């Protein structure tokens, strides 16, 4: 309970979510990350990137002991067992998937003996910088600041100790208590308590019904099903947008400053996720993303961006939350993402691959989709020979990245092969794209290959390689005679 957030490890967190946002729950019973009401909203629990004083909700036995945890089969319901000298209790954490619920429910069940518990809710809005006003009425506490409001419903009397809303309870074998935290608007009546066990049953049913549609034989069924559930948790149910991750500023490497905000929808990452879901038989999610993309593109598809907010809006200005010390003390903590303004040519190929995969499983293109794709291809024709920041979103000078060029080639190739999209373009345009595809291939084979070593290079004029090049054969790109294919 007393461990400060900088001493924690990311592998000790479990994910719970409701398709609107997600929370990270540590094995010690502390929820250290939660943005409400959306994935890309401000965090009200930011201890993951700082200390407990930056917002968290700790619920655990008062006495020290050991803990173990697991997900309930085929769900995002997380169970943590605490074993102590006095007894054994189980903490069940989940987020109800009911529309408009905006809730975290925590149920404690006594399995053996008698265990004393303490709940300490330390709310901090605006990524740990704003302490709310708190009003307590017996077993209900309300915290609010600006437009945001959070209400805690507890099983007994609540009190305030410093900045924390505290509750203590004793659970014996066979007994059960429930806590419910809900988000609402500070201008409206605080949302009521949720029937915990009914919500638990409905949440389990939701996840099990969804994963129950997966019927493909695999050597690793449990791992695949868990991966699919996690991907599903990254989809913003209200729009169909797919985020890259529910967190910001977890460093790419220990003690590095490569800390980025991934709570947004990258077209590249979303296309990869969509393809995986299609392969697993989940076509509704693919169609929802296609529709999200059409809305995000609007009436000027040639201005399509590499990433968006979950609702399809485009403002992702990057700034630094200077008051947060960072995960395990690794600064800076970035909010927003400046890479949104970068040119990354690879997104167009991945986007067209995703559209092609959707068509193969019967998701028919709409007229608007045809217009979007034709416009995107016209845009690729205008910019494909320019340098970009590449798959790795390098923040230095742009280069002619080989992977980006091949991805741009793939976009044109997929368009040429998709006769069902040609209705949005005249015959001359299609013929021009055939020639462009061939011209792009010739240039890549000339400038993107080290003939002496028999390998592609990371970017034109370089002798470096990078892992993205391993994907070129999967994109259907003929390998310029490197492996004797020509």
Spans of model-derived segments:
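Acidic, mature catalytic/reactive cores of soluble proteins
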Residues: 1-486
């Amino acid at each position: 309970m007393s461990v400060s957030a900088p001493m924690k490890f990311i592998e000790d967190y479990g994910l719970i979510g409701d398709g609107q946002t997600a929370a990270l729950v540590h094995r010690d019973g502390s929820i250290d990350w939660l943005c409400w009401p959306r994935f890309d909203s401000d965090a009200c629990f930011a201890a993951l990137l700082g200390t407990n004083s930056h917002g968290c909700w700790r619920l655990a036995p008062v006495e020290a002991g050991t803990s173990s945890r697991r997900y309930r089969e085929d769900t995002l319901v997380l169970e943590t067992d605490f074993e102590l000298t006095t007894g054994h209790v189980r903490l069940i954490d989940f987020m109800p998937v009911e529309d408009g619920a905006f809730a975290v429910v925590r149920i404690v069940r006594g399995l053996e003996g008698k265990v004393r518990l303490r709940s300490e809710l330390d709310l901090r809005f605006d990524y740990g910088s704003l302490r709310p006003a708190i009003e307590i009425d017996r077993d209900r506490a309300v915290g609010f600041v600006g437009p945001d409001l959070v209400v805690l419903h507890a099983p007994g009397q609540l009190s305030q100790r410093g900045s924390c809303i505290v509750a203590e309870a004793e659970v014996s074998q066979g007994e059960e208590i429930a806590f419910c935290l809900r988000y609402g608007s500070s201008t409206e009546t605080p949302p009521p308590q949720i029937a915990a066990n009914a919500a638990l049953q409905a949440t389990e049913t939701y996840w099990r019904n969804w994963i129950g549609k997966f019927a493909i034989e695999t050597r690793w069924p449990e791992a695949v099903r868990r991966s699919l559930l996690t991907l599903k948790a990254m989809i913003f149910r209200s729009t169909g947008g797919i985020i890259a991750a529910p967190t910001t500023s977890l460093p790419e490497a220990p003690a590095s400053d490569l800390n980025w905000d991934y709570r947004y929808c990258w077209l590249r990452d979303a296309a990869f996720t969509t393809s995986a879901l299609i392969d697993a038989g989940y076509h509704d999610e693919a169609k929802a993303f296609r529709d999200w993309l059409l809305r995000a593109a609007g009436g000027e598809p040639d201005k399509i961006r590499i990433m968006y907010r979950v609702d399809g809006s485009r403002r992702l200005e990057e700034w630094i939350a200077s008051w947060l010390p960072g995960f395990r003390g690794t600064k800076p903590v970035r909010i927003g993402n400046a890479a949104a303004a970068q040119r990354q040519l690879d997104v167009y190929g991945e986007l067209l691959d995703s559209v092609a995969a959707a068509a193969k499983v019967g998701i028919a293109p709409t007229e608007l989709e045809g217009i979007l794709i034709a416009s995107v291809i016209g845009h690729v024709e205008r910019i494909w020979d320019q340098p970009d920041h590449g798959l790795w979103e390098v923040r230095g000078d742009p280069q002619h990245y080989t992977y980006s060029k091949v991805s741009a080639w793939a976009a044109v190739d997929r368009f040429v092969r998709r006769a069902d999209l040609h209705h949005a373009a005249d015959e001359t345009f299609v013929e021009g794209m055939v020639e462009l595809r061939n011209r792009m291939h010739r240039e890549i084979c000339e400038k993107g290959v080290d003939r002496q070593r028999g390998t592609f290079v990371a970017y034109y004029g370089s002798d470096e390689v990078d892992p993205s090049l391993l994907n070129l054969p999967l994109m259907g790109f003929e390998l310029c005679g490197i492996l004797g294919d020509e």
